[in-house]
Amino acid sequence: MKQYFVTGTDTEVGKTYVTCQLLRAANNASLTAIGYKPIAAGCELVNGEWVNEDALNIQQASACANGQTLPINEINPIALTPPIAPHIAANEEGVALTHEKIAEGLNALAAYRPDILLMEGAGGWRLPLTIGSDNTPTHYLSDVVKALKMDVILVVGMRLGCLNHALLTAEAIRADGLIIKGWVANDITGNMTRYQENLRSLKAMLPEPLLAEIPYQTGIEAGTLLSAIEQLS
């Protein structure tokens, strides 16, 4: 079983979309693949359960060997109501964002023994989990990923500023002693000026492999994601 952490250069860069595309591609390649979003904010009460749209998409894209649909509270064990920064939402709701809770959920999904397990973060790499009395963060989600020694998939949202965001995020991941397995260029606007020039710059500046280039709201060629899955499996 291979486990990866999916992070992004910012919030709203398509982490969930990329995660779901990779899960489906793996399942279509006769592999079992499960997604995990330990923390999600902006949840709504549906049939007695707190549900986040991203977590629901991951649930639908995941597949176990026995074909069962995993419970949403296993895909997303920490569901927060306000659509705000998770550590602020957790503080307001009296919820503890702990390493133990996140690792426990990961281990529960690993027990299904999928070929690939993707854990998706929230926001960017340095997402605060807990803060001290002076509002200074004391723990970050990246600390959990570091402790779990997970390789990282970096989703780059292709928009103005992505070069700086990608380089800084990659530097932070490497500084934490983790391996970037590869990165995904996700076209999130469809109208980025000098898109190809920016993509070429990223290829030149990031030593890690480009796993896939995902176009804006159009079909993805099967071979594109199959190549990514071959590198991940």
UniProtKB/Swiss-Prot annotation:
The keyword Translocase does not apply. The active site is at 37. Its cofactor is Mg(2+). SUPFAM superfamilies: P-loop containing nucleoside triphosphate hydrolases. ATP binds at residues 12-17, 54, 120-123, 186-187. Mg(2+) binds at residues 16, 54, 120. NCBIfam families: bioD. It comes from Alteromonas mediterranea (strain DSM 17117 / CIP 110805 / LMG 28347 / Deep ecotype). It catalyses: (7R,8S)-7,8-diammoniononanoate + CO2 + ATP = (4R,5S)-dethiobiotin + ADP + phosphate + 3 H(+). PANTHER family: DETHIOBIOTIN SYNTHETASE. One of its GO terms (molecular function) is ATP binding. One of its GO terms (cellular component) is cytosol. Catalyzes a mechanistically unusual reaction, the ATP-dependent insertion of CO2 between the N7 and N8 nitrogen atoms of 7,8-diaminopelargonic acid (DAPA, also called 7,8-diammoniononanoate) to form a ureido ring. This is ATP-dependent dethiobiotin synthetase BioD. Pathway: Cofactor biosynthesis; biotin biosynthesis; biotin from 7,8-diaminononanoate: step 1/2. Keywords: ATP-binding, Biotin biosynthesis, Cytoplasm, Ligase, Magnesium, Metal-binding, Nucleotide-binding. Its main location: cytoplasm. Homodimer. It holds the Pfam family AAA_26. The lineage of its organism: Bacteria, Pseudomonadati, Pseudomonadota, Gammaproteobacteria, Alteromonadales. It is found in: Cytoplasm. Signal peptide: none annotated. Belongs to the dethiobiotin synthetase family. The gene is bioD. Its EC number is 6.3.3.3.
